[in-house]
């Protein structure tokens, strides 16, 4: 596929002789390519099938989220956080509400902290299942997507039961969470797809509360992960496509500011849940999976192992929440809305609710940086308040932006087919990259 052009004849005597010059050619990868994972436009300079240079172009999903958050009261921007990395919704909310809580000087009740920890890990599993299915599909393994979405659907039902939305939950609030865990789970209804014994089997775990459902999920999920690994871990085609591809040395990972699996896959044990614990991560037991070679295969193994660790954390949170009832919102009426029951017969409570959600509340002047260990890496929120009811400045630290910056250094020298594997291993979502 090299571009070949014929050089002009040097003189009349050798006019019949021709000289060929081989030069590199340029290829546009995306933004319409199905493996671009959104709107990535990657301009590749190719020498045959080998990548000489990669130039990622971003901005096609830029929506001005930071400026939007600066134009609204603090408590009205939580919904914007869901729409950044729209596969890791509640983790984004967590960073933002923690920043507000730090400036106000409040702390969520212990039960709310456990609920946040549990839903952070549910979100991590949701993200990794999406990554596992889509990355395998990019490399030609279609069945894995069908397996992964089987469990993902169950956890999406948990999102819907707690917030009413399958994706953009807006469940975390400064001072706690929107509401306590429900006593019932939504059930499948009889249809042409669900009927008879299959319907009873699907609803068997949904007879009790959400905690009962999650307890059943944590008991069965390890076997489901074993099924994913049966399909991929020792699959020779999968290993040929990922082993030794996209190797990132530890010093390179640190130099580019990588976090999350991109860093731990290279053997560096940096995890904010362990190094700078927040919520209730210091009260639960879990390990940090590490890679040894820093290639795509190691990062795959790390993400699969992380799902097992997230399952352990969820199980511990469920056990604690079952025996420890309590408040899920601070009793600080500056940030906490009145109870719904009181608004039915108390005009003052109704006015309080209206003003809280229409005008918000003033946050003391100051600045803070709050970060969480999101599924893709360190997601941070740098927040500046000037004492008004709106932020003076909101800056969001998206892990995908730092990772994408290293694309040129990582993909050079690899084949064109390997670029798909490397884009997949980055686990990019352009809602957070472009913001």
Curated annotation (Swiss-Prot):
GO terms for molecular function: NAD binding; NADH:ubiquinone reductase (non-electrogenic) activity; quinone binding. The keyword Chloroplast does not apply. It is found in: Cell inner membrane. NCBIfam families: NuoD, PRK06075.1. It comes from Xylella fastidiosa (strain M12). The keyword Transport applies. InterPro entries: NADH_Q_OxRdtase_suD, NADH_UbQ_OxRdtase_49kDa_CS, NDH1_su_D/H, NiFe-Hase_large. NDH-1 is composed of 14 different subunits. Subunits NuoB, C, D, E, F, and G constitute the peripheral sector of the complex. GO terms for cellular component: plasma membrane. It catalyses: a quinone + NADH + 5 H(+)(in) = a quinol + NAD(+) + 4 H(+)(out). Its main location: membrane. It is a peripheral membrane protein. This is NADH-quinone oxidoreductase subunit D. The gene is nuoD.
């Amino acid at each position: 596929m090299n571009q070949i052009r014929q050089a002009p004849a040097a003189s009349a005597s050798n006019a019949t002789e021709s000289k060929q010059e081989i030069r590199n050619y340029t290829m546009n990868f995306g933004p319409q390519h199905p493996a671009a994972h959104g709107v990535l436009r990657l301009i590749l300079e190719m020498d045959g099938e080998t990548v000489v240079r990669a130039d990622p172009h971003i901005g096609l999903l830029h929506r001005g989220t930071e400026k939007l958050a600066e134009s609204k009261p603090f408590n009205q921007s939580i919904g914007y956080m869901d729409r950044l990395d729209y596969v890791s919704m509640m983790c984004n909310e967590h960073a933002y509400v923690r920043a507000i809580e730090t400036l106000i000087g409040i702390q969520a009740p212990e039960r709310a902290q456990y609920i946040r920890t549990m839903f952070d890990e549910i979100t991590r599993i949701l993200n990794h299942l999406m990554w596992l299915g889509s990355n395998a599909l990019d490399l030609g393994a279609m069945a894995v997507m069908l397996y992964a979405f089987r469990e993902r659907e169950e956890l999406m039902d948990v999102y819907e039961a707690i917030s009413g939305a399958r994706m953009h939950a807006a469940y975390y609030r400064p001072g706690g969470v929107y509401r306590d865990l429900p006593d019932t789970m939504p059930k499948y209804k009889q249809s042409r797809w669900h009927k008879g014994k299959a319907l009873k089997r699907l609803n068997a775990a949904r007879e009790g509360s959400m905690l009962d459902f999650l307890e059943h999920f944590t008991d069965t999920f390890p076997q489901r992960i074993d099924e994913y690994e049966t399909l991929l871990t020792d699959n020779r085609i999968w290993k040929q496509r990922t082993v030794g591809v996209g190797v990132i040395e530890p010093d390179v990972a640190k130099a580019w500011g990588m976090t999350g699996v991109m860093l731990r896959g290279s053997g560096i044990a940096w995890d904010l849940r362990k190094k700078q614990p927040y919520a209730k991560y210091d009260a639960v037991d879990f390990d940090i999976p590490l890679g040894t070679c820093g290639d795509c295969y190691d990062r795959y193994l790390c993400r699969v192992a992380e799902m097992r660790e997230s399952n352990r954390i969820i199980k511990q949170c469920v056990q604690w929440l079952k025996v420890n009832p309590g408040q899920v919102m601070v009793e600080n009426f500056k940030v906490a809305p009145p109870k719904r029951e009181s608004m039915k017969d108390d005009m003052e409570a109704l006015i309080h609710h209206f003003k809280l959600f229409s005008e918000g509340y003033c946050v003391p002047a100051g600045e803070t940086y709050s970060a969480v260990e999101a599924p893709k890496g360190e997601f941070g929120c740098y927040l500046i308040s000037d004492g008004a009811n709106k932020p003076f400045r909101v800056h969001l630290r998206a892990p995908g932006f730092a990772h994408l910056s290293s694309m040129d250094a990582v993909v050079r020298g690899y084949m064109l087919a390997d670029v798909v594997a490397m884009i997949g291993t980055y686990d990019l979502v352009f809602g957070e990259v472009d913001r």
